[in-house]
């Protein structure tokens, strides 16, 4: 987690430096002798995972208000008074990790963590916190309240999962009789009205003709996801053959999605283990019978999930890294 601290007094600055020594991050001083708060907040909202204000809560609220977008996008925001008595998560308590961060910071300076989210206050299962713990993206953040609201009202909720989830489900959480009856689902292929939690375990294997533009790759990728009902939020990186290292369109496409690229030689691709779609033409050009499937499997160190798909000179495939979800959702659970 990338943290950024700001304080407004000498006492607050000393506390910020103490906190940063335990939870590393940059430290700035705001006010007449320091950075401009509006500029600092805008910059850190764009580049940091967590913003920590050491000062009045009202200062933090006014500073962050223009930048708040959604549960899924906003960084964690925590405020501590300059005396280090209280640590209050203001924004992104679960998905952004502000609740956990507030507790960590409170432990450093012996403050009281002030956690105000209803599920935490009542000890009720928090589906968004569980998603974060399992390294899942939340496809529809607006549906979180439906699951949490039902549990807070004393009702049960049903889940579906495409993987076995180890351990005992939390109180009030039961397996759905059918996938289309689930209130929330752990899946890479979301359908229906459930809250979908998308494991970040997928690697996109890419093959393309020389000179393929980012726009053409984007169009192909959108069609690929639509045809397979695949959630793009599950992709964590992309992979291809080293012959594509200098393709500007491929680089721009991956950069737009925030994916790093892995490139493999033909010899390395031939070592991949799975059942692959073989092409004599691809073999004659690249020295290996398949690029997208083999590259995805190697980069994921896992198994092929969606086999080779081709359109307009673009080939795509998806492989999955090993994934073993469990029902732990609190940091103090073993």
Which residues does each predicted region cover?
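Extreme N-terminal starter segment of soluble prokaryotic enzymes
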Residues: 1-5
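Conserved mixed alpha/beta catalytic, RNA-binding, or beta-rich assembly cores of soluble enzyme
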Residues: 12-18, 25, 34-36, 44-50, ...
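Conserved acetyl-CoA-binding loop-helix of GNAT-fold acetyltransferases
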Residues: 41
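Terminal alpha-helical anchor/extension segments at protein ends
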Residues: 203-207, 220, 288-334
């Amino acid at each position: 987690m990338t943290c950024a601290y700001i304080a407004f007094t000498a006492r607050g600055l000393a506390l910020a430096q103490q906190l940063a020594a335990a939870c590393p991050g940059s430290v700035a001083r705001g006010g007449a002798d320091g950075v401009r708060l509006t500029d600092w907040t805008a910059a850190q909202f764009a580049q940091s995972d967590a913003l920590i204000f050491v000062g009045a809560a009202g200062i933090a609220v006014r500073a962050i208000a223009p930048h708040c977008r959604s549960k899924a996008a906003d960084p964690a925001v925590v405020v501590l008074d300059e005396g280090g008595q209280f640590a209050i998560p203001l924004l992104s308590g679960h998905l952004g990790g502000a609740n956990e961060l507030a507790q960590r910071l409170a432990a450093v300076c012996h403050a009281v963590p002030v956690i105000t989210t209803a599920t935490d206050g009542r000890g009720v299962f928090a589906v968004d916190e569980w998603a974060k713990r399992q390294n899942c993206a939340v496809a529809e953040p607006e549906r979180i309240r439906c699951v949490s609201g039902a549990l807070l009202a004393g009702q049960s909720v049903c889940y579906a999962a495409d993987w076995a989830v180890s351990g005992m489900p939390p109180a009030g959480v039961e397996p759905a009789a059918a996938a289309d009856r689930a209130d929330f689902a752990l899946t890479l292929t979301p359908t229906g009205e459930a809250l979908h939690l998308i494991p970040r375990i997928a690697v996109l294997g890419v093959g393309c003709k020389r000179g393929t533009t980012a726009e053409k790759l984007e169009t192909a990728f959108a069609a690929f996801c639509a045809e397979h009902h695949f959630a793009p939020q599950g992709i964590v990186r992309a992979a291809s053959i080293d012959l594509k290292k200098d393709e500007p369109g491929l680089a721009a496409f991956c950069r737009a999605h925030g994916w790093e690229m892995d490139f493999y030689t033909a010899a390395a691709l031939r070592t991949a283990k799975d059942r692959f779609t073989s092409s004599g033409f691809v073999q004659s050009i690249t020295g290996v019978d398949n690029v997208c499937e083999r590259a995805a499997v190697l980069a994921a160190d896992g198994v092929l999930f969606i086999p080779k798909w081709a359109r307009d000179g673009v080939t795509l495939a998806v492989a999955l890294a090993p994934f073993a979800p469990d029902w732990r959702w609190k940091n103090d659970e073993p």
